[in-house]
């Protein structure tokens, strides 16, 4: 199908599903089609060369990633009119690869939420077809997930701090990918938690502007070590973390997990239980570390340096929130207060430093589980030889399928939503790559299953993900556009 025809179908989908509120801003149709036409003419020319696999494809961008063509609001009143003077590195690289940015997607304000409900522009929802109530799109990249699932775009960029790409992907029945921390540039991404935020082919690579970006020399060293010890085309060791087998798992989720492991076993791969004993502390550690970093990162939004300024703001001493900063949503204010407390002199030892310690132990648990060592922290090839361990870990992405939006709204406490991240947060704390795939469960909606691998070993992760998708993912995803990924 010609690129122009695909783009027109995507625009029709964007119009049809407007009520789902997945988009905050959209490129004008003439400008968008003009860019696609230019790509099509370039590819159809005598040389027939495209810039990349995404040349002429429509890409949506989460609204906490800076763009010069659209406002970057972070779904907050404070930044409602803010237009960045530069493109984020991932956006610039996507444009250089020929991608057409079709718009900015809705999200939880500043990335803080699990259902994309905490937005100044209203909640995101999944399509309520056949008279059924609307379901949650997940968060915080719910707008990106819905845009892909409904065929509004070829793929979408999101950010994954504690599962904010993988959880929406699981709920919406699409693919969501979080790379190893530092592999994609975070420059131009509005930070929630610097040490946890992550945003592949066209956009992968080092960026001098991002101090957390892995250098070319380190990337080369890691890939060289991995390639020399990787089991190419051989029987893989597939682990399932015992601590993820929670009593709260819904039966369809547990069944899909078991079916995935059974399918991999039928392909002659070895299945083994793995213990990650300290991941039970992951959720509580995350909700100390992330708000602490957020309280620091959001301090600049005071109406002077960045953001909307309330005329009533007199910067009165003693106010917890000035009138300007009171324009943060309730969930953002809640996390700022929690983060500020955990960094206070009376709490930092008991909360923040202990959470940092828990994070390091969780990273060690994951590193010890894999057959390959983490070559980011070791250069010793001998360390990986003969080591017992697995090549990847397989686990669910969520405790259940997407809940009904009304049920989420009726929760007595916002804290009830935090538990939704319990299965995605561990990989974020460890900084390892993880991909969520939709796996069919009988005649029902797909269930999100994640594949996790050692730091930098995206290749093995992709290999196993392909086996799962080919065997259990047939026909999943949107009726219009099955399994295009939302990457972070």
Curated annotation (Swiss-Prot):
The active site is at 62 (charge relay system), 140 (charge relay system), 164 (acyl-ester intermediate). It is found in: Mitochondrion. GO terms for biological process: glutaminyl-tRNAGln biosynthesis via transamidation; mitochondrial translation. Its main location: mitochondrion. One of its GO terms (molecular function) is glutaminyl-tRNA synthase (glutamine-hydrolyzing) activity. The keyword Nucleotide-binding applies. Keywords: ATP-binding, Ligase, Mitochondrion, Nucleotide-binding, Protein biosynthesis. Residues 218-227 have a biased composition (Basic and acidic residues). It catalyses: L-glutamyl-tRNA(Gln) + L-glutamine + ATP + H2O = L-glutaminyl-tRNA(Gln) + L-glutamate + ADP + phosphate + H(+). Its EC number is 6.3.5.7. One of its GO terms (cellular component) is mitochondrion. Pfam families: Amidase. Residues 205-228 are annotated as: Disordered. It comes from the Eukaryota. PANTHER family: GLUTAMYL-TRNA(GLN) AMIDOTRANSFERASE SUBUNIT A, MITOCHONDRIAL (PTHR11895:SF7), TRANSAMIDASE (PTHR11895). Belongs to the amidase family. GatA subfamily. Subunit of the heterotrimeric GatCAB amidotransferase (AdT) complex, composed of A, B and C subunits. Allows the formation of correctly charged Gln-tRNA(Gln) through the transamidation of misacylated Glu-tRNA(Gln) in the mitochondria. The reaction takes place in the presence of glutamine and ATP through an activated gamma-phospho-Glu-tRNA(Gln). This is Glutamyl-tRNA(Gln) amidotransferase subunit A, mitochondrial. It comes from Tuber melanosporum (strain Mel28).
